[in-house]
C-alpha cells in the first residue's frame, strides 16, 4: 500500500502519513484522545497508518454495528504482533486467539459466566464475603486516618473473587504475594497497549529487547502463579464432583491440553482483575470530585437499606436507579478499554454499501470517542448520572430522548456508550463486572465519605495502557455516623 495515495475507489479520508512512521506523529500518550480529535476532522471512520500497520478507526455507532455485529465473521480475528503472540501462547487465548481456537475457548468459558450462574447463592456468597473483607481493610485505614491504596485494594478484592470462582481459594493461600501479582498484571497491560512501539514497528523488535524481556518476566510470573494453582487443584480433583470453574475446565478439555487450559485461566484472572479495579477507581474519583453526587447516592442507598446495614446484598441493587446511573455514566465518560481490542479484516468488504475495507486492515473501535462526542451526546464532558436515570425511564415508554434531533443516535445512550464492546466477541462477562462494581461501591459509600487529601478536584485525565486508570491519588475514608 502507498501511504498517501488513494488506495481504492471508495477510499476513506485520513491524516497525511510520513515515511516509515505514518501517522504516529499525531498520537500522544493518550491515543484515545488523539484518535477522537482526528475523528472530528475525518469523520466516523477514517484511515491512519500506525507505522507499517494500515488501520481504520471507527467511532460511528452505525458503522460499529455493521462491522462488529452484522459482519462479525469477517472481523473475528485480531491483528498479530509480538506481545499478543507471547501473551496468548501463539494466539490460542480468549482475548487474542484466532478462530477456531477462540470460538472453542469462548464457548467453554462463557458457560460459567452467565447471569444465572453469577446470581447463584454460591457466587453471591463469595462476593459478599470478599466485600466484607474489603470493608474491614478500609475500616483500619479509616480509624487510623491512613490513605487507602484504591488500585491495590480493589485489585485484591476483584482478584480474590475471581480466584474463588476459578479455584475456590484466596490469593493469601497461594505462594505468591498479592502485590507482586497485581504489579505484574499492571506491567503486562502496559506492553499489550496499541501505543507500544513494537505494535507499530514489529521488525524493530531487537531494539525493544529490554521491554520485551520485562514483559516476558512478568508474564512468566503470572503463568507460574496460575500453573502452581492448577497443580494444587489436581491433587484433590474428582471428575464426578467439580468444585469450581477450573475443575469444569479440566473435565471439558478431554484432550488434556494443559496449555490452553492455563491460558484461559490467565485471560480470566488478568483481564478480570484489572478491569474491575480500574472501573472502581474511576467510580471513586468521580464520587470525590462531585460530593453532591456522592451524597445523593448515599441518600438513595440509606433509603433502601437504612443506616444500620453495613454490607449490601444483590437484591438491594435493583432498587437503586441513581446508583446504576452513576455506574453507567462513569463507564461512558471513562470506558476502561477505550479503544477495545483491535480486529483485522479477513477479506475485502464494503460497509454501508460504499465504504471499502481492504483485507488485512486493522480496525480500531473508538469506544471513548463515541461516548465523548457532542455529535452523539449532550454535554459529553459533564458527569451527569441523571441522564441515565431519565434515559431508562424513557426507554420503558419507547422513547430515547432524541425525537427532535437529526441524528438518530443522539442521546441514545445504550447505542453510543458500549464500554464492554458489542457482538460475539465482546467482554466475557459484563454482568460480573457490573455486579461486583455496583455492590462494592454502594457498600463503600454507605459506610464512608470518600475524600482526597486536598481541596482541589482530582485530575480526571487518564493514564493509558490497554486499559485506562486515573492518575495516582490518595483516598481517605471518613466513617459515616
Swiss-Prot record:
GO terms for molecular function: heme binding; iron ion binding; monooxygenase activity; oxidoreductase activity, acting on paired donors, with incorporation or reduction of molecular oxygen. Keywords: Heme, Iron, Metal-binding, Monooxygenase, Oxidoreductase. Heme binds at residue 427. CDD domains: CYP1_2-like. InterPro entries: Cyt_P450, Cyt_P450_E_grp-I, Cyt_P450_sf. It holds the Pfam family p450. Its cofactor is heme. Transmembrane segments: none annotated. Its EC number is 1.14.-.-. Belongs to the cytochrome P450 family. This is Putative cytochrome P450 520B1. The lineage of its organism: Eukaryota, Amoebozoa, Evosea, Eumycetozoa, Dictyostelia.
Amino acid at each position: 500500500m502507498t501511504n498517501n495515495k488513494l488506495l481504492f475507489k471508495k477510499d476513506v479520508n485520513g491524516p497525511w502519513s510520513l515515511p516509515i512512521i505514518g501517522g504516529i506523529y499525531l498520537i500522544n500518550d493518550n491515543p484515545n484522545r488523539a484518535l477522537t480529535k482526528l475523528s472530528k476532522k475525518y469523520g466516523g471512520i477514517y484511515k491512519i497508518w500506525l507505522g507499517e500497520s494500515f488501520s481504520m478507526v471507527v467511532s460511528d455507532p452505525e458503522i460499529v454495528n455493521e462491522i462488529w455485529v452484522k459482519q462479525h465473521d469477517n472481523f473475528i480475528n485480531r491483528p498479530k504482533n509480538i506481545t499478543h503472540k507471547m501473551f496468548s501462547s501463539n494466539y490460542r487465548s480468549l482475548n487474542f486467539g484466532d478462530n477456531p481456537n477462540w470460538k472453542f475457548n469462548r464457548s467453554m468459558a462463557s458457560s460459567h459466566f452467565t447471569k444465572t450462574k453469577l446470581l447463584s447463592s454460591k457466587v453471591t456468597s463469595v462476593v459478599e464475603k470478599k466485600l466484607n473483607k474489603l470493608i474491614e481493610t478500609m475500616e483500619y485505614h479509616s480509624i487510623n486516618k491512613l490513605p487507602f491504596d484504591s488500585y491495590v485494594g480493589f485489585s485484591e478484592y476483584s482478584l480474590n473473587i475471581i480466584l474463588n470462582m476459578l479455584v475456590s481459594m484466596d490469593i493469601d493461600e497461594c505462594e505468591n504475594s498479592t502485590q507482586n501479582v497485581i504489579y505484574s498484571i499492571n506491567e503486562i497491560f502496559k506492553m499489550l497497549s496499541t501505543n507500544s512501539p513494537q505494535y507499530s514497528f514489529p521488525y524493530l523488535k531487537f531494539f525493544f529487547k529490554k521491554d520485551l524481556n520485562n514483559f516476558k518476566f512478568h508474564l512468566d510470573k503470572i503463568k507460574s502463579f496460575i500453573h502452581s494453582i492448577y497443580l494444587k487443584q489436581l491433587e484433590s480433583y474428582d471428575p464426578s464432583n467439580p468444585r469450581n470453574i477450573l475443575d469444569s475446565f479440566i473435565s471439558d478439555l478431554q484432550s488434556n491440553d494443559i496449555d490452553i487450559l492455563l491460558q484461559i485461566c490467565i485471560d480470566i484472572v488478568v483481564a478480570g482483575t484489572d478491569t474491575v479495579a480500574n472501573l472502581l477507581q474511576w467510580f471513586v474519583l468521580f464520587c470525590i470530585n462531585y460530593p453532591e453526587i456522592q451524597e445523593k447516592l448515599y441518600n438513595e442507598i440509606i433509603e433502601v437499606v437504612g443506616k444500620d446495614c453495613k454490607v449490601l446484598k444483590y437484591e438491594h441493587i435493583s432498587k437503586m436507579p441513581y446508583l446504576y446511573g452513576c455506574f453507567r455514566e462513569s463507564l461512558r465518560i471513562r470506558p476502561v478499554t477505550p479503544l477495545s481490542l483491535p480486529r483485522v479484516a479477513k477479506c475485502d468488504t464494503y460497509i454501508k454499501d460504499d465504504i471499502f475495507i481492504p483485507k488485512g486492515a486493522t480496525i480500531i473501535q473508538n469506544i471513548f470517542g463515541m461516548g465523548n462526542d457532542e455529535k452523539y451526546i449532550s454535554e459529553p464532558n459533564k458527569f451527569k448520572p441523571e441522564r441515565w436515570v431519565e434515559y431508562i425511564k424513557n426507554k420503558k415508554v419507547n422513547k430515547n430522548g432524541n425525537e427532535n434531533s437529526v441524528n438518530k443516535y443522539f442521546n441514545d445512550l445504550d447505542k453510543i456508550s458500549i464500554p464492554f464492546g458489542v457482538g460475539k466477541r465482546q467482554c466475557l462477562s459484563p454482568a460480573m463486572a457490573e455486579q461486583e462494581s455496583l455492590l462494592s461501591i454502594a457498600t463503600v459509600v454507605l459506610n464512608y465519605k470518600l475524600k482526597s487529601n486536598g481541596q482541589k478536584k482530582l485530575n480526571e485525565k487518564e493514564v493509558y495502557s490497554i486499559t485506562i486508570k486515573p492518575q495516582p491519588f490518595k483516598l481517605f475514608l471518613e466513617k459515616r455516623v
